[in-house]
Amino acid sequence: NSYYNNKLGDKEDYCIYTDTDSVFYSAIPLVKKDFPNADLTDDKFMTEKILETAEVVQDYINKSYDLFAKKFLNIDEHRFDIKQECVAKSAFWVTKKRYGQWIINDGGIVCDRLDVKGLDIVRSSFPPAMRKLMTGVLQDILGNVDKDSIDEDILKFKKEMKTSDIQDIALPTGVRKLTKFKDKTPRGA
């Protein structure tokens, strides 16, 4: 955050999300500062500038590890090293280890894909029809689709759900050892 604060001349917190070994920052404030008239919707331009910005920030952080290691850990040599992994066009953060992001560059390789961690849509215990709907809704949200259009899709799904196959809308779980309960007296009997 100190790099951002020094460059932008403020004391704002620009960190979006932290995890055990990851930090997520928006590079948009830095790109806006360096290119005030830039078209921020131009994916190619933004990816290029974000990768350049990430490299500068990465070098800044890695150099600061020398001071950190000496001052706080009293060691001269260390193995701390940070690197930029992906560029996300948009993201949806719920809580720690639960998010979805639309990645347009992964490790320097151009891509265009949804990356989801911890949300129900990636869990095998989530009903298939709901997984399909919620994946579509997440893609639409990250793709900046109009809210009314998303609402229409949800209402259409709700209407179609009444005639859907139970296998698609029920939880995909089973009951083990069903015979174990065959001779049990029902509760309340």
Write out the residue ranges for each language-model feature.
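DNA-dependent DNA polymerase catalytic subunits
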Residues: 1-20, 27-189
